[in-house]
């Protein structure tokens, strides 16, 4: 097991990474001394892991659960309200603990409900997908979607702990594994060229959920994100770099209808578009672009998702929260292993969209 600290101003929590951790959940949350526990999960995860989680937690405090019909299309205020209703029904108080057992959607909804219930109660993330383990469970971003865009309603609410049991990833469909690898590739691209090269070499083993390959990769991705979050918790500067590929990716998700493409699939395509943008701005060369596209393709992710109207895509991206005053600000690559924020000329963006198959 590897412990990755997340050091914030005046406080710290730990990401525990390793196989077999789910059965230690109760032992690890006991130090939080909750008056009661509510586990929020989805139907798929409930069938696989809920009984084990509850069995581990029951000796610690009265434990109840709520099964949320979680999907990206249903990640909205109504879903968060259902979790709040479940907390009320469970007679939760300000010393209660909410446990988010599931993928990124469950974590986002449950974390947001924890942030708003009684002005904030503690919660613990137990991510069950690769994407959630390496990215969405770390850093305290919680929220839900709005018709106008992804994650427009939310709050920063840090978990008390993250427990990333890598053995849970063996139950993932291949498509979900690939989706998580998009964030792994992203971390190497924006922060660590050596890690990016390591991921390139490990890709076949990662796709097979090889334990010896997965553990170090999950821990390294968590450490990269934890370092950025520790330096910029509220995204006033450096943390925005973690959005590499996401302005494009969020637009793809919104235009195609939430759920048509997994978040990681849209981000994988977004990474390629961001790399193309970087090449057109003479920040990276064509060899770097080809290498990035090959890494995304080798993760079995789409390099291009064509067919969208350019005007609609641009309008969608202008509404993204990484746009300021209507100006288009993107995270670009200065080289593999280093990202930066840049204002992008409209002509360059248009050329990238044309190259990506937009009409």
In which residue ranges do the predicted regions lie?
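ATP/NTP phosphate-donor binding region
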Residues: 1-97
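Short glycine/serine/threonine-rich phosphate/pyrophosphate-binding segments
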Residues: 105-112, 133-134, 250-251
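Active-site segments that bind and position negatively charged phosphate/pyrophosphate groups
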Residues: 197-311
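C-terminal charged capping/lid subdomain of soluble metabolic enzymes
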Residues: 2, 182-184, 283-359
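Alpha-helix C-terminal capping segments
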Residues: 109-120, 255-256, 276
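Glycine-rich beta-strand-to-loop/alpha-helix junction loops that act as flexible
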Residues: 70-71, 101-103, 244-245
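A glycine/threonine-rich phosphate-anchoring loop and its flanking beta-alpha core
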Residues: 112-205
């Amino acid at each position: 097991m590897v412990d990755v600290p997340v050091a914030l101003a005046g406080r710290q929590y730990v990401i525990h990474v390793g196989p077999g951790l789910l059965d230690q959940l109760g032992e690890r949350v006991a130090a939080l001394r909750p008056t009661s526990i509510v586990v929020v999960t989805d139907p798929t995860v409930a069938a696989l892991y809920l009984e084990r989680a509850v069995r581990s937690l029951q000796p610690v405090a009265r434990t109840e659960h709520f099964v949320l019909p979680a999907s990206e299309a249903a990640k909205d205020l109504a879903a968060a309200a259902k979790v709040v209703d479940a907390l009320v029904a469970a007679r939760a108080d300000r010393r209660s603990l909410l446990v988010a057992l599931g993928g990124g959607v469950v974590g986002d909804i449950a974390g947001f409900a924890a942030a708003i219930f009684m002005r904030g109660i503690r919660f613990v993330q137990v991510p069950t997908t690769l994407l959630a383990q390496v990215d969405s469970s770390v850093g305290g971003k919680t929220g839900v979607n709005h018709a106008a865009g992804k994650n427009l309603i939310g709050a920063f609410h840090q978990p008390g702990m993250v427990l990333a049991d890598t053995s849970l990833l063996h139950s993932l469909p291949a498509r979900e594994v690939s989706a998580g690898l998009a964030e792994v590739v992203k971390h190497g691209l924006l922060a660590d060229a050596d890690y990016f090269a390591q991921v390139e070499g490990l890709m076949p083993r990662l796709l097979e959920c090889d334990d010896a390959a997965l553990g170090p990769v999950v821990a390294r991705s968590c450490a990269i994100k934890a370092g950025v979050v520790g330096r910029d918790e509220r995204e006033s500067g450096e943390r925005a770099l973690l959005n590499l590929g996401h302005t494009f990716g969020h637009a793809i998700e919104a235009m195609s209808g939430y759920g048509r493409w997994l978040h990681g699939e849209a981000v994988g395509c977004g990474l390629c578009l961001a790399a193309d943008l970087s090449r057109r701005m003479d920040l990276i060369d064509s060899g770097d672009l080809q290498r990035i596209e090959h890494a995304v393709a080798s993760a079995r992710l789409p390099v291009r998702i064509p067919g969208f109207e350019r005007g609609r895509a641009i309008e969608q991206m202008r509404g993204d929260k990484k746009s300021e005053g209507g100006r288009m600000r993107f995270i670009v690559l200065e080289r593999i292993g280093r990202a930066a924020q840049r204002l992008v000329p409209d002509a360059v963006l248009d050329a990238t969209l044309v190259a990506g198959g937009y009409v």
